[in-house]
Amino acid sequence: NFCGGFALNAVLVDLGSGTCPIEVYMRIQDYQNKEIIEKNPNSSASIYLLGNKSSGTLMSLPSGICAAFKDYVTDRTVTVCYNSNFERGPLENLISEEISRITGERLGMKIQALDVLYSEITWDYILVLVNNKHWIAVKHVNKDKFVCYDPAEGKDSDGSTMGKAIENLRKEYVISGLYICI
C-alpha cells in the first residue's frame, strides 16, 4: 500500500521536487487520517480505508495523493480522470466523496470524466490505478513513447502507448479507469 506515495515520488523526482518515498506516503496518510478518517469516520472512504489495510498500511486515495502533491512546489496542475467503468466498479461508493474532496476549497483541483484517455493524452505524467488497488507512474516521453514505473518491484518498462507500456510491465495489470494526470 505504499505504492501511491512511491509512484508520486517518482514523478516528483523527475520534476526535481522529489524526496524520500516514505515521506511522500506519510503525507498522503496524514491527509487521509486528518481529513477523512478523523473528520468523517462513517464515510464510505473511511470504511474502505480501514477495511482494506494491507500489512497495517492504508491505500492511497486520489484525494490523499492530490493533497501530498500540493505540498510540493511545482508549476503543475492536477486533473483526476475516471472512466465510466471505474465509476460503476467496486470503488463506486467513493467517487462522489472523492470528487467533493478533490474539487473542494482545500485541494481545488479538477476532475474529468472521460472514456478516451488514450487518444487524448496531453499530460506528461499519469498515476494509473491498476487492479483497483495498485498505483503505478507513467511518463509520456513523446508521441509514441511511454515509460512506466512500478513501485512494487522498482521496475520500469516502455511502450508505444500507455496501455502497451503497462502490459510490458506486468501482463496481469488491468487498468482500473482512474488516473491522476499531472
Language-model region placement:
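Conserved active-site-adjacent core of cysteine acyl-enzyme catalytic domains
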Residues: 34-135, 139-176
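Short, solvent-exposed mixed-charge patches
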Residues: 181-182
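Active-site nucleophile-adjacent alpha helix/oxyanion-hole segment immediately C-terminal to the catalytic cysteine
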Residues: 1-41
